[in-house]
Amino acid sequence: MLRSLQHVESHINQCRRISTTSTLLKNRAGKTKSTSNRTQLLTYEMAQKPHHIGVRKSWLTWHSQNLEEFRQSQPLVVAQDEVVRRFIRGFFPQNLVVSGNEIVIKRRGNVLIVAGFLQYSRRLDIRRIYWMFGFAEEFLSILLKQPVKLELSFVESEETVAYNYI
């Protein structure tokens, strides 16, 4: 009995050293799935791989949150970002490009900068656009108690922003 137990133990130890299973290749994080008829729009930022975030997309990562004077707690930053995204989606509902996913929120010192693209509609006149920008900046500044600057660009259509279709 003792001999058979030793045989089983040596067999288990040998199995631990050699792996015979195939790899599952489940390292596809951040990769967008392609469609059968290439209808899904990709912008330049969406087309980049996640490991290029610090190289090709570094302008998205410049922030001042690690400086001692401007440090904020993580839940506060996440809540502020969600408030800004929901406000922009609600205030410019007909003008959003790529369903509002391309809104970039940057923090430089005490200033919150919101960048992105809006689709130009023929119904908007220039006075209304300036009023909407001014109101949005002022409302978000009062709500978040820090200066907010909008850097939103208007494009003719979503195809202008498209980098690739998959």
Swiss-Prot record:
What GO terms in the biological process aspect are recorded for it?
mitochondrial translation
- The organism's superkingdom is given as Eukaryota
What is its subcellular localisation? Answer: Mitochondrion
Q: Name one GO cellular component term.
A: mitochondrial small ribosomal subunit
GO MF entry, a single one: structural constituent of ribosome
Specify the transit peptide boundaries. 1-25
Kindly state which keywords UniProt assigns to this record, in alphabetical order: Mitochondrion, Ribonucleoprotein, Ribosomal protein, Transit peptide
* Transit peptide keyword on record: yes
TM region(s), chain numbering: none
Subunit description: Component of the mitochondrial ribosome small subunit (28S) which comprises a 12S rRNA and about 30 distinct proteins.
Q: Which family does it belong to?
A: Belongs to the universal ribosomal protein uS3 family.
- Specify the protein name: Small ribosomal subunit protein uS3m
